Amino acid sequence: MAPCPQPESCPAGSPLGLICLSLLLIPASAGTYCECSLGLSREALIALIVVLAGVSASCFCALVVVAIGVFRAKGDTCPGHSENRLVGPYGVQEDRIDLHTVHVESHLMDPDLDVSMMPSLDGPGLMTMTAPLEPPPPPPPPPPLPQ
């Protein structure tokens, strides 16, 4: 039979204590008896430990992803390493733009409607308007100060 801590020495609440408790529950699940109780059944404790292990694994994976991102960011700022990149107001941007022709075909378009039938925007129906620039009106006087 595996030795088990007394009820007053049970680690209540700490993740390390729950992991240690899970090591104590392994012999308990094999048919031995353990006096240590946190007010939860053995199945509930095992489920809690599984959930904590999953959360720990997720946090570890997130930490690895952040660490890789930091190492890559540090690698891009090496003074001897130069690439075709510009630092703009929205972060690092490529200095060349690759534009590809995109052909868009609409299935909602009327097949009888031809592009040549569309009126040109440069037609006689459109004219340019010029507006004279006027100086802005003076600002209103400030309100009198209360006395």
Curated annotation (Swiss-Prot):
Transmembrane segments: 48-68
Biased composition (Pro residues): 133-147
Topology within the bilayer: Single-pass type I membrane protein
Main location: membrane
Regions of this protein lying in the Cytoplasmic compartment: 69-147
Region (Disordered): 128-147
Subcellular location: Membrane; Cytoplasmic vesicle, Secretory vesicle, Acrosome
Top-level taxon in the UniProt lineage: Eukaryota
Signal peptide residues on this chain, from the entry's feature table: 1-31
Database matches in InterPro entries: TMEM210
Extracellular topological segments: 32-47
GO CC, any one term: acrosomal vesicle
Keywords: Cytoplasmic vesicle, Membrane, Signal, Transmembrane, Transmembrane helix
Protein name per Swiss-Prot or TrEMBL: Transmembrane protein 210
Name of the gene this protein is made from: Tmem210
